Amino acid sequence: MNRTTEIIFDNLFSSLCAEYYGDKAEMAPMSAWKWRQADMLRKKADTVEPYSSAAVYHFVNALQERRRERIVNDERHAIDTSVETLNLLNIIVYNINHIERIGISLPGIISLGKYMRSLGDKVDFVKFDSWTKTLHIRRMTSLMASILVQTMGFEPSELPFLYAEVPNAREMLCRYLMSDAQDGTWNRSLSLYRFSKLGMIGFWHRKIKEMLDNIEE
């Protein structure tokens, strides 16, 4: 990215931090044209399906989804059921589903940050840590946490599911927001493959099945 684009994104992320987290940061002066560009990026980010706490989100990969269902069922019947931990898992799955089908959801990442700031202290991270291992999603949770650290001013200590920071997480988000790829393709996010191999396999399995189902005999 050139310096102009970097300034636009710096101010975009600063304005989002102020709006959603109350973090005031000094923004660089920008021309009206640059602010229009920032507004266009913001509008694109807001076009995604928003996270809803009333919805249940699912994995693209069937194996991961079966494991998620088992985890949720076992937790709901546990003596020490942690609703906050289940809710965190739901937000994480929403973000993973969106990343695997379309691309990074900035509103989804913001929702994750808001949840951690408001209810993170009530989450049982011993349980959550075991779930991330069972579901093979630690690279994905690290990507989400890295975006929060690099764009929203979070400290790594606020995000226990950050197992290894992704150095170029901010750049990946910026590239996605600037891309023009179409919904439902992995063309704009092939670099995400290393974060979710199971998800990519599940995505293409579903796409092939849909194509076969649509073939007229």
Residues covered by each model-derived region:
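Conserved NTP-donor binding/palm subdomain of two-metal-ion nucleotidyltransferases/polymerases, i.e.
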Residues: 1-217
